[in-house]
Amino acid sequence: KHDNGVGALCTPIFQTSTFEFESVQQGGARFAGQEEGYIYSRLGNPSLTQVEEKLAALEGGEAALATASGMGAISSALWSSVEAGDEIVASDTLYGCTFALLNHGMSKFGVGVKFVDFADLAAVKAALTEKTKVVYLETPCNPTLKVVDIAEVAKIAHEYNKNIRVIVDNTFCSPYIQQPLSLGADVVVHSATKYINGHGDVIAGFVISDAEFIGKCRMFGLKDMTGAVMSPFNAFLIARGLKTLDIRMERHSANAMKVARFLHDHPAIDKVYYPGL
């Protein structure tokens, strides 16, 4: 529970770009990082803080960063993890825009990317080099729903180099069904546009990890690189949506299984891609 200062059951929408200081000295201390407090909503806002705390708790992370979209989350996490000359080992089955960022965007800045079938753990291990800084995957993958063994991939990466950052896109499961950090991942990213918000009226994303990395994402990946800041109103809507996450995910899963079984038995369907079958 986030203390909003007024005892409101639902956190108010702090629709402001800037915040006041009690004195010049206080402003200087905040800009210097010597005092905690809000400065400018690109760096932090109470509406965003309360929903970030909820996502961190749901995923079992120390901290979270709210972003304006799922791609904002992915980009902020990646730009905070690599620099020119580094390499990323990524799953060969990814959301189209993520693939475009890795396949086209990263190369423009001198970052190499290797795409590997993550069902082949030996291939994942073989792709790692001393230049590898990130192992990136989705599970279930978009759009085929292929399942990747997070624990085994994380084990392989960290045994090769404990400093490799394993980043998992958990959009398709949500933290209600799967918590990648508990399986050995270092960072979780979400498109909150989907199940996290759940009402089709928000575009948003999150990065969840340890406090040190989230601080780096906030002050470099988000502030300086992407600028993909979530609006206070969208943070309010997501906090509302999270209240029904468990109920919605139970119904989504039950309905999906019914559809998958129906299609599996239908004579006109050759194959159904669904991990529940």
Name the predicted role of every residue range.
Residues 64-268, 273:
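Conserved PLP-enzyme active-site core in the AAT-like
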Residues 23-75, 97-104:
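Conserved N-terminal alpha-helix of the aminotransferase class I/II PLP-enzyme fold
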Residues 1-35:
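N-terminal glycine-rich, Lys/His-bearing helix-loop that initiates the first secondary-structure elements
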Residues 14-16, 41, 273:
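Residues in well-ordered beta-strands of folded domains
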Residues 9-13, 36, 63, 234, ...:
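A generic secondary-structure signal marking the coil-to-beta-strand transition
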Residues 275-277:
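Active-site loops and adjacent core secondary-structure elements that bind or stabilize anionic groups
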Residues 17, 27, 34-39, 91, ...:
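A general marker of short, structured functional hotspots
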